[in-house]
Amino acid sequence: MILFKSPRFTRLYCTFFLLLVLVLTLVGSRIDPARKRTGGALRVVADRVAQLSSRPWSRVGAGDTAEEAHRRAWELARATQYAGTGARVQRFLEKALRGEPFTVAAIGGSVSKGRGLTPPKSAQPEPEGEIHGATTLYSRENLHFLVFDWLNATFPHPNNRFVNGAQGGVGAGYFAWCFKEHIPTDVDLVLVELGINDLNHLRVIAKYELLVRSVLELDSAPAIINIETFTTLFHELISSSALHNDVLAYYDIPSLSIRDVLLPRLMADPDVQMPRWFRTGGDVSLGDDKVREWGGVPVDLMHISAKGHGLAAGLIINYLSTQLALVAPSTPKGLFGRFSAARLRKTLEHVYDIPDTWLTQSFDPTELPERRAPVCRSMNSAKLHNRVSGTDDVPENDQVRGLVLHPSSHGWEPWAWMEKHYLVARKPGALAVFDFVISAPLPATHDDDDDEVIEDPLDVYSAFEGTATRAASVRREMPTRLRLKDQVAARQEQPTRRSSTFRKAHNEGSSDGGTVAIGFQRSANYGLGSVHCWVDEDRTKGRRLDGWWEIKERNMGIVTEVATGLQPGRHRLQCELLADTLDPLKRHEFRLFAIVHN
């Protein structure tokens, strides 16, 4: 019996059975030419499954003992914050299984950049020929590189591509507007890691939703896998991952976290385990607000170590392996079940795809939300754009990188700290002026396939027949449902009713006009000052933005709105450095790194 359970026997048996299927299919196609198309499809899948069966790395845990298999399953279960259907990930794996090249990209902060990891022997240049970002973006210890390395080994193709778009010290508020500045738009799989970058505040929900929804709406229809790291630095262990997870569930995005796998070990022996899983050595020293001493060793509690990266990557790879087992089973029974399962998924997945309504907006199935394309100009992007933001529809000959100041600006200059780039002002009265164009909203879209009447869920439980009840329920006949587009047409003939309670607080998805915001640094350590920003000539409706804050452990880039409700057309944003400052030492420096609008 042990022989029949061994991975080697399973691979041999599977390969033999697939060859038998191919022979029978070829014979059948000679008898019935109509079967040739089916035979071709079977041959492609059979070849790929046979190749996978010969690669020991394609099946995580293929050689595990029973105890190791149980432990591996336990760790994945503890790490899984939301599993979902896996439909998009399976769709990505099916593409790879067909032998097509794929692109994997990463969105994240300094953990994803590889803070403290060993740089690769040669840094990977950007397509434009300039390296923008840390040299550890493509470290062989980086969790995202490790995931791509496994995928590339499992599905080798010379045109497989990995792009690490991580940016240190920013969160979903930045990437929601600017992710296209850092990753390609033809991406197939996006790995997101922002658990310690986003503040633990309800406002994060809307920003995070804008990010994941915008990524899912790319023409390439990518899959997303969310991975959360964690920190023990603050007063509570709970973090923004708690706010991310409801958004991830709403959009059926799998989410994994290393926290609940590591915590039992950290609690059992912190002096030994903390230096193993978090960053040490190098520039880690006491006196840094992110550093605490464990076991006599200074430990950076915001950034996981190379071993921590390996754990995060291993959990993602384990998850991918479980999904691969569904699309490329290693047993004959599973292989044939796969075809019916794939067809069933394709009939169901439109039900669970991108919802017509936002999670952070009021429910109204007859009023589709406006779609506004985010526009970003970032000092940390290598992409070229027209000088006036929002006019890239007609490319100019002298396109530039970063932010372009209007000639009327004064007192601002480019400045960089390592790989982070800013426009900086230090003298009160300095004025930054930017021209930008608000575009008209994109037409609301709706898939006619969604007009089908969806059957009730199967898991609607009823009492067994004969069970005594206090009162019999009365079954009412439900009225015939209008097709959604007919409801929309009927609604347009009625006065518009709109609940604005949440929408006023959720400007990222607002349908009440365009928005403009700026990205700037906040810190308690850098002596940062304040600016007053306004749009066009209405200075009185402007907004004060403070660079200094009280959070000593975080030096972060924040994106904050200046104005909303802007009409389509050309506008002018102005920001003036104020003499008044929150910095205890009365310093004034202000660091601006992005202008975003829609």
Residue ranges of predicted features:
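Oxyanion-hole/transition-state-stabilizing segment in secreted/luminal serine hydrolases
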Residues: 105-107, 113, 117-119, 130, ...
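Extracellular serine-dependent O-acyl
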Residues: 30-31, 53, 223-228, 239-295, ...
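Structural recognition of the beta-strand scaffold that forms the well-ordered cores
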Residues: 103-107, 112, 161-166, 188-194, ...
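Soluble non-cytosolic domains of exported or imported proteins
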Residues: 102, 137-142, 169, 173, ...
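N-terminal secretory targeting modules
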Residues: 1-107, 111-137, 156-158, 298-598
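Alpha-helical scaffolding within the catalytic cores
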Residues: 87-92, 148, 172-183, 206-214, ...
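Active-site segments of SGNH/GDSL-like serine hydrolases
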Residues: 193-197, 210-245
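Signal peptide-proximal N-terminal region
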Residues: 127, 144-162
